[in-house]
Amino acid sequence: FDAEFGVWLAAHPGLPCLLAGMVGSRQGWAEAPYAACPAGLADIARQLLWLQPGRLAIVPGLSCESDGVPDVLRGEETQVFGALQALQSPGMAGGPHTLVLPGTHSKWVQTDGGQMRGFRTHMTGETYALLRQQSILARMLPAEDGDLDADAFDAGVAQAQRPGGLLHHLFSVRTLALFDRAGGAALASRL
């Protein structure tokens, strides 16, 4: 830690430093226990893991029960509370709101009254990367992601809403290429 932040801390004496994200995970610098939903900013503040009291703390992640199993997030709570602050404008205050945080593990967060009520994690980016790089579909796709083909993306979303199931719809990326009905960037966008 000192190798990374020692100079910064020395240059800013007395300024508190909050660390968020995987730094508080089991694989991080120190494990900060999860705070349970529902949770507001004050709940998070009460559960800070102080490494140097009053100076340096790790922000806890959050946990909730989602469909009968535990779900967790670390770091995204800082984005959510920032968004909740922005939503305090007239006509937007309170809630409820659903905030979507796209990424490797996308989060759909339910908020109400300035609190995070619960959330669901989806392995969107990670699944895309695995399919894109290590499945039979990889050979059909361009080596690098290019610009989004919005029409192909919309077609993929529309197909996902039809009967047949996710795995069948994923295989259709291959068959569309085999029958020259789509190729390249369109396939990647559809996927």
What are these regions (language model features)?
Residues 1-9:
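Short, well-ordered amphipathic alpha-helical segments that serve as non-catalytic structural scaffolds
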Residues 6, 24, 88, 136, ...:
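Residue-level marker of positions within ordered structural domains that often coincide
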Residues 3, 37-41, 46-51, 178-190:
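Short, intrinsically disordered, charge-balanced linker/junction segments flanking boundaries
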Residues 25, 31, 36, 118-121, ...:
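Generic structural "secondary-structure junction" signal
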Residues 8-73, 113:
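Short beta-strand-loop/turn "lid" adjacent to the catalytic site in phosphate-handling enzymes
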Residues 63-93, 97-98, 102-163:
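Glycine-rich phosphate-binding loop plus the immediately following alpha-helix
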Residues 159-190:
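Adenine-nucleotide phosphate-binding core of ATP-dependent small-molecule kinases
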